From Swiss-Prot:
InterPro entries assigned: Aminotrans_V_dom (IPR000192), Aminotrans_V_PyrdxlP_BS (IPR020578), Cys_deSase_IscS (IPR010240), Cys_deSase_NifS_bac/arc (IPR017772), Cysteine_dSase (IPR016454), PyrdxlP-dep_Trfase (IPR015424), PyrdxlP-dep_Trfase_major (IPR015421), PyrdxlP-dep_Trfase_small (IPR015422)
Catalytic activity reported: (sulfur carrier)-H + L-cysteine = (sulfur carrier)-SH + L-alanine
Keyword terms of this UniProt record: 2Fe-2S, Cytoplasm, Iron, Iron-sulfur, Metal-binding, Pyridoxal phosphate, Transferase
Membrane-spanning intervals of the chain: none
Cross-referenced Pfam families: Aminotran_5
Species per Swiss-Prot/TrEMBL record: Clostridium botulinum (strain Kyoto / Type A2)
UniProt name for this protein: Cysteine desulfurase IscS
Signal sequence extent: none
Record-listed [2Fe-2S] cluster binding positions: C328
Localization in the cell: Cytoplasm
């Protein structure tokens, strides 16, 4: 296996050299606890403050509205549990969608066991939630609406501004999981009426294990982690200075590079989509067909008569790394909840492949995938009873 092509940037990214360079002194030289009062900790305090400033600038938020966490999952947990527990006297109803990340869905299911009511809204065949459906689901008990900014599997960019306006009008808190959106979509929490927003550094070329939750001033929220008085009394635990510095630098670079990077990724995405559709019969592009409403790095196809896990292994043997819509990492054989939610039959959802592009991908990478993938699909279909049945049924029709 000579050539290696990584196309799973929605799962994680590498840490950019400029980010690592800024982080390194905080492991060995400037290691003071940012909460300590002596002058030795001044550099760490300043570094954490600078990172907070960089994040707030990227979102058009205030500095004191940014709270650092251990990642996107913690931020999502904090947003849902924190709002639910702090506002239960006002109401006990939460609205979300069926295609959220498991950090939202599993937290919502946990809250249901705690006595909260959760409405899981459907989406259309491209993954869009209807603002009208949200409006119709709101009751006197509704305290929170949580809708992801952009979907991690099929790249759908949701109508966040319209949802924000509705929530403001109804006086309901609005949270968005923006883990996939940072660096790809313009975000303005004021203009979009967002009350809470989650992010994770490792999705935009920062380190793993650090994220942030934006909490608009005045939002009533309970702490998730209790202990010391860090993060202005809202989130206990000694600050991960190096990680926070990395997040701050990474988001600054993501904002600077966004127009150029998005153009490059959109062009590569177009080349890949057109190439697959031209070379492989009976394929279905999952997610929005209008590319302006889709993440610029997202490609997700279903291949009739193919098992996703087998396809991944075949690609791996050829040095291509992507992901599947199947829950191959768990004991479950159920396909992706996202693909089922957009109406795909089980067997179609099982044969799905997500290729998510990033900074190091080139046209040569795309062409290599277009050389290898059709051969694998052809070979696997020749051995597939699913494909045989499908073609037989098609001929009969």
């Amino acid at each position: 296996m000579n050539k290696q092509v990584y196309m799973d940037y929605s799962a994680t990214t590498y840490t950019k050299p400029e980010v690592l360079e800024e982080m390194l002194p905080f492991f060995t030289e400037n290691f003071g606890n940012p909460s300590s009062l002596y002058s030795f900790s001044d550099k760490t305090k300043k570094a954490v403050n600078l990172a907070r400033e960089r994040v707030s600038k990227a979102l058009n938020a205030e500095k004191n509205e940014i709270f650092f966490t251990s990642g996107g999952s913690e931020a999502d947990n904090w947003a849902l549990k924190g709002i639910a527990y702090a506002n239960k006297k006002k109401g006990n109803h939460i609205i979300t969608t069926k295609i959220e990340h498991h950090a939202i869905l599993h937290t919502a299911q946990f809250l249901e066991k705690e006595g909260f009511k959760v409405t899981y809204l459907p989406v259309d065949e491209e993954g869009f939630v209807s603002v009208e459906d949200i409006k119709n689901a709101i009751t006197d008990e509704t305290i929170l609406v949580s809708v992801m900014f952009a979907n991690n599997e099929i790249g759908t960019i949701e109508p966040i501004k319209e949802i924000g306006e509705l929530c403001k009008e109804k006086n309901i808190y609005f949270h968005t999981d923006a883990v996939q959106a940072i660096g790809h979509v313009d975000i303005d929490v004021k203009d979009m009426n967002i009350d809470l927003l989650s992010m994770s550094a490792h999705k935009f070329y920062g380190p793993k294990g650090v994220g942030a939750l934006y909490i608009k001033n005045g939002v009533k929220i309970q702490n998730l982690i209790h202990g010391g008085g860090q993060e202005r009394g809202k989130r206990a635990s000694t600050e991960d200075t190096a990680g926070i510095v990395g997040l701050g630098k990474a988001i600054e670079l993501a904002m600077e590079n966004m127009p150029e990077e998005n153009e490059k990724l959109s062009n590569l995405r177009g080349r890949l989509i057109r190439g697959i559709e031209a070379r492989i019969p009976e394929v279905k592009l999952n997610g929005p067909k209008d590319m302006s409403r889709r993440l610029p790095n997202n490609v997700n196809f279903s291949f009739i008569g193919i098992e996703g896990e087998t396809l991944l292994l075949d690609l791996d043997m050829n040095g291509i790394f992507g992901s599947t819509g199947s829950a191959c990492a768990s004991a479950s054989l159920d396909p992706s909840h996202v693909l089922l939610s957009i109406g795909l039959p089980h067997e179609t959802a099982h044969g799905s492949l997500r290729l998510s592009l990033g900074a190091k991908n080139t046209e040569e990478d795309i062409d290599y995938v277009l050389e290898v993938l059709p051969k694998i699909i052809k070979q696997r279909r020749e051995m597939s009873p699913l494909w045989e049945d499908y073609m037989k049924n098609k001929e009969e029709k």
